[in-house]
Amino acid sequence: TMIGYGGNDTYYVDNAGDKVNEAAGGGTDRVLTSLNYALAAGSEIELLATTNPSGTTAINLSGNAFAQTIQGNAGANVINGLAGADTMVGYGGNDTYYVDNAGDKVIEAAGGGTDKVVTSMSHALAAGSQVEVLAINNPSGTAAMNLNGNEFAQTIQGNAGANAINGLGGADTMIGYGGNDGYYIDNAGDKVIEAAGGGRDTVATTVSYALAAGSAVELLAARYPSATTAINLTGNEFAQTIKGNAGANVINGGRGADTLTGNGGNDAFVFNTALGAGNIDRITDFNKLQDKIHIDNAIFAGLSSGALTSAAFFAGAAAHDSSDRILYNNSTGALSFDSDGIGGAVQTQFATLSPGLSLTAAAFFVT
């Protein structure tokens, strides 16, 4: 048992049973250890560190209720600051940090192993800290927590509550474990992973973005609806609501029965997936004076690339001659494809617009 009575004391620990007692206000004190060590409750130590920062022996360090700087070594450290607002520093190795105070800060240099921050509360990684994984300590917990990455690429994992996850600059992988999660995208390489049935989830983006296959996200939207920067948004096989901004957006629902909103600007709505009853999209704000519908001739067979010819379009419930291919029902808003006009093929609906738009072939472009 080592006791200081004031002054800037240094304690050397080489036995797991060693105990350091330091009263509050007793100087700036440090503990240097060559083995796993946890500070005693009530001992106001300012620095807990390994004796050899370049050593590769795995050493685990725990603080106490006071604020400490805790420094590992080049091995795989487990560092837990406990209650205080701690600064935790790794010197290489695959380190794990436990965060339980909003003021905790993790410092990790580039190339310092594969490092993980595990938190029991909302947490934002410090700029310049190259941590590879940021995760909530209890994935099945339902407490709402917000997680922010930094300029590096991270995997960020939420819990079963309503999380707000923002990867920031790097190409991040963001994972929700249930709850109504919100994901913020600012890198085209960001990936959102959401299992089916995991709540009502939103992806808000400042860049053009395509949802990953298999990610059951309900809403994909431009983060700033009034912005005029052109952003392209693409859904996946699930049904989504997709909302653009005031710029010229290219919006593609992918498969699934999607609800598409351009939100102003000269928008293009893309249809390039197999037609069917489960793949009928609704366009909520189509403006024939500025928006276009882009149809893929690999799906809409027989149409020539470029502007749709007037002969291939008909406004009516059914084709009226053999050249009609794209049909707009002015009464219901249904938009359909008929592969042979008045021949024997049945028309297939692929979208629903507002009724009464008085559309013409000029609203369509074949790609």
Sequence positions of predicted segments:
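Short glycine-/Asp-/Thr-/Trp-enriched loop segments that recur within the blades
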Residues: 55-57, 141-143, 228-229
